[in-house]
């Protein structure tokens, strides 16, 4: 009964009922099946405390090396290659005892035949603050059952084959005739016996028991449910949850619903109101065939945890776990030692997440950006490290914008600046000519310092964008500090009342153009305006779904 499970370059596959797996027998040069690698550990002596022999010897009967069972799928169109590889990753950064299955379909993203994902909108930080920074009661719904369990047609299973190499991926240098007592070949086999492999196999043994023998062999699997990325792209996932949110808004117009990818949040004025809405939504979703996971529903109260942020009525801040991790990493950075730019990339990615909540914003990380762009090593000085620590220890919330009328305008020329308010005109000159974008930024900073206005009118697109990383480093840091919490609205140069003062002319005060700030909500599909509900609904409205939600659908 010694049979060998093939590597991934198989010729013909049979599928069994438990996991739709396929195996064939491969013979060595002598015409006999080679011995199973898993059973070889049973006949050897342990090489140490982390030897796989300890796991293998815990059972006397590991069963045959083949999967038995009735073949449920026989397709003559089975392709002669697998679709992707499969591997395990941690459940989340805080839980390494559980794992989730990840399938590698990256071959479809390479070469001239690669498939591009459609672009989908991502809400920025200011949009989240404007939409969700309210004094409401919140809860998060887990709707993953709606799109993670889409059944696949049996005829399409052979086109999504996935291979697992088992233990033999680690022993590529181990030939098929190495189990004959050769010491050097046994040492090659015992190269698997590491602490990481031993702990992983021990965890799998506690879960699967005797089935671990089959997992140690290469095998080929097919899907019974569509995997993420095949049946549902990120774009379609965002559209799907947006449709669910729009449906909830139409039927419950007195609540707030927001969706991003697989995360859907629901808000109401009181907890009692929220509980009533939640019970109704559960029944409505169940009629649509969507089972909400009640155990994963999280009640947040006034502090909504969404996309890694804590959103309250006072603004948006990052979650404490991100701040603590960032502080720990930043304190462990060595001083006066060159760091590879790849390390700087990972550190900058962590710092970027919290940068909008610091006084200097992204501009404080410009030295790291330059080192990464030039692919050179970066040396942290003690002064720069202590400055970053002081910046990231004091975080300021991103507050929601208010719809107010603009009463302060700023403009500049390469040689001068001008400020116009409802009651005065101010102007000045620079010591030497400056680039126009730099001059406009300085004029906006002066207007903010002298008037304290939270809304400024300007005609420069660079200042309007708020991206100051293209300016000189110290100027960008100071401008971020001064203009923090300041909004901008665009005014054409011909209508800008600060245009003439910036040229050294002080005309008579005239009425200012009436410009009102519209809080930024971005044109995103995630917050699409729902059509109003007709006050007179038709009589014959059936909420019952044609899909059976209690019993599985069996084809005729």
Curated annotation (Swiss-Prot):
PROSITE patterns: RT_POL. Its EC number is 2.7.7.7, 2.7.7.49, 3.1.26.4. GO terms for molecular function: DNA binding; DNA-directed DNA polymerase activity; metal ion binding; RNA-directed DNA polymerase activity; RNA-DNA hybrid ribonuclease activity. InterPro entries: DNA/RNA_pol_sf (IPR043502), DNApol_viral_C (IPR001462), Hepadnavirus_pol/RT (IPR052055), Rev_trsase/Diguanyl_cyclase (IPR043128), RT_dom (IPR000477). Residues 60-401 are annotated as: Polymerase/reverse transcriptase domain (RT). One of its GO terms (biological process) is DNA replication. Activated by host HSP70 and HSP40 in vitro to be able to bind the epsilon loop of the pgRNA. Because deletion of the RNase H region renders the protein partly chaperone-independent, the chaperones may be needed indirectly to relieve occlusion of the RNA-binding site by this domain. Inhibited by several reverse-transcriptase inhibitors: Lamivudine, Adefovir and Entecavir. Keywords: DNA replication, DNA-binding, DNA-directed DNA polymerase, Endonuclease, Hydrolase, Magnesium, Metal-binding, Multifunctional enzyme, Nuclease, Nucleotidyltransferase, RNA-directed DNA polymerase, Transferase. It catalyses: DNA(n) + a 2'-deoxyribonucleoside 5'-triphosphate = DNA(n+1) + diphosphate; Endonucleolytic cleavage to 5'-phosphomonoester. Mg(2+) binds at residues 142, 262-263. Residues 1-59 are annotated as: Spacer. Residues 70-311 form the Reverse transcriptase domain. It holds the Pfam family RVT_1. Residues 402-556 are annotated as: RnaseH domain (RH). Terminal protein domain (TP) is hepadnavirus-specific. Spacer domain is highly variable and separates the TP and RT domains. Polymerase/reverse-transcriptase domain (RT) and ribonuclease H domain (RH) are similar to retrovirus reverse transcriptase/RNase H. The polymerase/reverse transcriptase (RT) and ribonuclease H (RH) domains are structured in five subdomains: finger, palm, thumb, connection and RNase H. Within the palm subdomain, the 'primer grip' region is thought to be involved in the positioning of the primer terminus for accommodating the incoming nucleotide. The RH domain stabilizes the association of RT with primer-template. PANTHER family: REVERSE TRANSCRIPTASE DOMAIN-CONTAINING PROTEIN, RIBONUCLEASE H. Multifunctional enzyme that converts the viral RNA genome into dsDNA in viral cytoplasmic capsids. This enzyme displays a DNA polymerase activity that can copy either DNA or RNA templates, and a ribonuclease H (RNase H) activity that cleaves the RNA strand of RNA-DNA heteroduplexes in a partially processive 3'- to 5'-endonucleasic mode. Neo-synthesized pregenomic RNA (pgRNA) are encapsidated together with the P protein, and reverse-transcribed inside the nucleocapsid. Belongs to the hepadnaviridae P protein family. This is Protein P. It comes from Woodchuck hepatitis B virus (isolate w64/pWS23). The lineage of its organism: Viruses, Riboviria, Pararnavirae, Artverviricota, Revtraviricetes. The gene is P.
């Amino acid at each position: 009964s010694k049979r060998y499970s093939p590597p991934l370059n198989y010729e013909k596959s049979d599928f069994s009922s438990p996991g739709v797996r396929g195996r064939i027998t491969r013979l060595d040069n002598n015409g006999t099946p080679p011995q199973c690698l898993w059973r070889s550990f049973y006949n050897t002596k342990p090489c140490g405390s982390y030897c796989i022999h300890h796991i293998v010897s815990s059972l006397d009967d590991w069963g045959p090396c083949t999967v038995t069972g009735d073949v449920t799928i026989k397709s003559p169109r089975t392709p002669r290659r697998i679709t992707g590889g499969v591997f395990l990753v941690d459940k989340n950064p805080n839980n390494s005892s559980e794992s989730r299955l990840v399938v590698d379909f990256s071959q479809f993203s390479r070469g001239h035949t690669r498939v591009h994902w459609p672009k989908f909108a991502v809400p920025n930080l200011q949009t989240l603050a404007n939409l969700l920074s309210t004094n409401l009661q919140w809860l998060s719904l887990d709707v993953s059952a709606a799109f993670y369990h889409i059944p696949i047609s049996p005829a399409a299973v052979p086109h999504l084959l996935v291979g697992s190499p088992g233990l033999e991926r680690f022993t590529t240098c181990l030939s098929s005739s190495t189990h004959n007592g050769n010491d050097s070949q046994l040492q090659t086999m015992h190269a698997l016996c590491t602490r990481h492999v031993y702990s992983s196999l021990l965890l799998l043994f506690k879960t699967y028991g005797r089935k671990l023998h089959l997992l140690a062999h290469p095998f080929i699997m097919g899907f019974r449910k569509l995997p993420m990325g095949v049946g549902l792209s990120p774009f379609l996932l965002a559209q799907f949850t947006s449709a669910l949110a729009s449906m909830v808004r139409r039927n419950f117009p007195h609540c707030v619903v927001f969706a991003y990818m697989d995360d859907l949040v629901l808000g109401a004025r009181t907890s009692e109101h929220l509980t009533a809405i939640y019970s109704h939504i559960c029944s409505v979703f169940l009629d649509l065939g969507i089972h909400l996971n009640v155990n994963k529903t999280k009640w947040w109260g006034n502090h909504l945890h969404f996309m890694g942020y804590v959103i309250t009525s006072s603004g948006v801040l990052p979650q404490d776990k991100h701040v603590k991790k960032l502080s720990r990493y930043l304190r462990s950075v060595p001083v006066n030692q060159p760091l590879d730019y790849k390390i700087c990339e990972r550190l900058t990615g962590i710092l970027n997440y919290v940068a909008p909540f610091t006084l200097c914003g992204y501009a404080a990380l410009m030295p790291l950006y330059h080192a990464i762009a030039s692919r050179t090593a970066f040396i942290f000085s003690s002064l720069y490290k202590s400055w970053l620590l002081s910046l990231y220890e004091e975080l300021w919330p991103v507050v929601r914008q208010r719809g107010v009328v603009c009463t302060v305008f700023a403009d500049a020329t390469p040689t001068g600046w001008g400020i116009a308010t409802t009651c005065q005109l101010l102007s000045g000159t620079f010591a030497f000519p400056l680039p126009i974008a730099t001059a406009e930024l300085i004029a906006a900073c002066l207007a903010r310092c002298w008037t304290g206005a939270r809304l400024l009118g300007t005609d420069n697109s660079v200042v309007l964008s708020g991206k100051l990383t293209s300016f000189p480093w110290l100027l960008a840091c100071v401008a971020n500090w001064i203009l923090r919490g300041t909004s901008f609205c665009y005014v054409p140069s011909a209508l800008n009342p600060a245009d003439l003062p910036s040229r050294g002319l002080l005309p008579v005060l005239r009425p200012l153009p009436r410009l009102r700030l519209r809080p930024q909500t971005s044109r995103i599909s995630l917050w699409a305006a729902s059509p109003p509900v007709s006050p007179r609904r038709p009589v014959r409205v059936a909420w019952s779904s044609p899909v059976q939600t209690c019993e599985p659908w069996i084809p005729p």
